[in-house]
């Protein structure tokens, strides 16, 4: 493993710098972007100076579709519906790992981890309209 680490570090000119291994929590200031329980949404970021590569990871977590399923989900999987207990930092594992032995291809990338807390399968909240039909070309 020491050989893998040495090889990976030699590929990056800034690898001799002290690397930050923790992803830091950033809470969004836009009050319309919230988790199921109304707590603010956010993301974790680990910047790697000198790297132009970015890895953005959207956490999975299924969904709820009624008051009953959402209440049940809140009792059993609260972390997927609220940011209230998110820690201020996280350490990535697997593809998010900052360790070259564990993640030889992406260890030095800028990393963004977006926790899933809205139970909407990342679909957002676009308002419904009464408009039907094909819009066609705009030119």
UniProtKB/Swiss-Prot annotation:
Going by the entry's taxonomy, the superkingdom of the source organism is recorded as: Eukaryota
Q: Lineage from the top down?
A: Eukaryota, Metazoa, Chordata, Craniata, Vertebrata
Looking at the UniProt entry, the stretches that span the membrane are none
Classification via PANTHER family: NOTUM-RELATED, PALMITOLEOYL-PROTEIN CARBOXYLESTERASE NOTUM
Task of the protein: Probable inactive palmitoleoyl-protein carboxylesterase.
What the record says about family reads:
Belongs to the pectinacetylesterase family. Notum subfamily.
Q: Which GO terms describe its biological process?
A: negative regulation of Wnt signaling pathway; protein depalmitoleylation
Q: What is this protein called?
A: Inactive palmitoleoyl-protein carboxylesterase notum1b
Organism per entry: Danio rerio (Zebrafish)
Please list the GO terms describing molecular function: palmitoleyl hydrolase activity
